[in-house]
Amino acid sequence: MGAQWKVKHKEAAANAKGRTFGKLSKEIMIAARAGADPDMNSRLRLVVEQAKKASMPRETLERAIKKGAGLLGESVNFERLTYEGFAPHRVPVIVECLTDNINRTVSEIRVLFRKGQLGAAGSVSWDFLYQGMIEAVPAAADADPELAAIEAGAQDFESAEEGATLFLTESTDMDAVCKALPEFGFTVQSAQLGYRPKSTVDGLTEEQMAEVEAFLEAIDNHDDVQNVYVGLAG
């Protein structure tokens, strides 16, 4: 599993679609503070690519951009919070939040972590890499992911779902690699900064795995949670 946790069960995944749009809308609004034109705002461009991949309705996407850029006369005040700790059975977890009420979020996340263990800053992040993660698909049959990774400046690459390739970059290089990949036969579908575990917990029983997944799903269901990263094998 390692890296970003995703809902596994079909019914839960279907119900998560609306939450995904809500999370992306927050990211779009924050990015759009620096300008509403994705061509002039690299951070906004990358989030818009994620939103399109998730099939966010165009009207929702455009409204989020306008709201974030202040074109609708509404202010956007979100703060970023990051929590570290452990799920049941000492599985390391990093949780990223965007909130308009820090006190509420802190209190509610503490409650959710009662079935695990909330740690201090640095308690588990030392065992994760903060990287750019670019998902791209070949635009031509002869596109070579290894060559593309080398030439575009990615650190590494690995196979992703549905024939895509995941290119891994230094956090500061992600935008440059995104721009370079099309030259080497790859179309970028999404790009984001996030955490990847250096090592993962394995050997859990079916019952233990169910406890971990229930914990992660409860965390991910919280309205202020944007991303959940976990060091879990499988």
UniProtKB/Swiss-Prot annotation:
* Keywords noted in UniProt: Cytoplasm, DNA-binding, Transcription, Transcription regulation
Which domain of life, per UniProt? Bacteria
What are the record's GO terms for cellular component? cytoplasm
Which positions, given as ranges, span the membrane?
Answer: none
Its localization reads: Cytoplasm
Q: What's a BP term from Gene Ontology annotated to this protein?
A: regulation of DNA-templated transcription
Tagged with keyword Plastid: no
One short Pfam family name for this protein? Answer: TACO1_YebC_N
Please provide, alphabetically and separated by semicolons, the GO molecular function terms listed in this UniProt record: DNA binding
Q: Which family does it belong to?
A: Belongs to the TACO1 family.
Q: What name goes with this protein?
A: Probable transcriptional regulatory protein PSPPH_2212
UniProt source species: Pseudomonas savastanoi pv. phaseolicola (strain 1448A / Race 6)
